[in-house]
Amino acid sequence: MFTKTFGCVRFIYNKMLGDRLDYYKETGKKLKNTPAQYKEEFPWLREVDSLALTNAQMNLNKAYSNFWSNKKHFGKPRFKSKKTGHASYSTNNQHGSVRIEENKVKLPKIGWVKLCLHRPLMENSIIKTVTISKTPSGKYYISILVEYENQILLIIPKKFLGLDFAMHGLYAVSYTHLRAHET
């Protein structure tokens, strides 16, 4: 199923890029298309996670915005090749669609997958995005983006000191009476 999702994400990216280039050549305007528009023509796109396809659209939009903001640095968006051997896709956690239990991770449209977690997740962390990658050697990796609040440690002071400064040259300290201000 990973291979199918990688292929569909690459296909939708390339199809949207090709359609956008053709439309721009014909009209000189930007085509605003979505992955959902292609599901009628290509019903096999329904078999994979829709958020993975939406993230492919967002990656294409980001590539175009980078290109238009700095043409010298970024260059024109290019078609994705299946021959590189590297493939990846990202999906978002919607209403608990991605979760980790014991040594397994649940992914949308795929189900439970064995996982070797390299470091534990923080308590009360919320999974935001998961990126699944395949290297040219055939190894799979999952990168998990989480959000959590830093817990501020409450420091309880042992002594309290109160100061009160008066403009006429005296100050009051909580453990004694009045003192003259020394300059």
Where are these regions (language model features)?
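Nucleic-acid substrate recognition interfaces
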Residues: 1-179
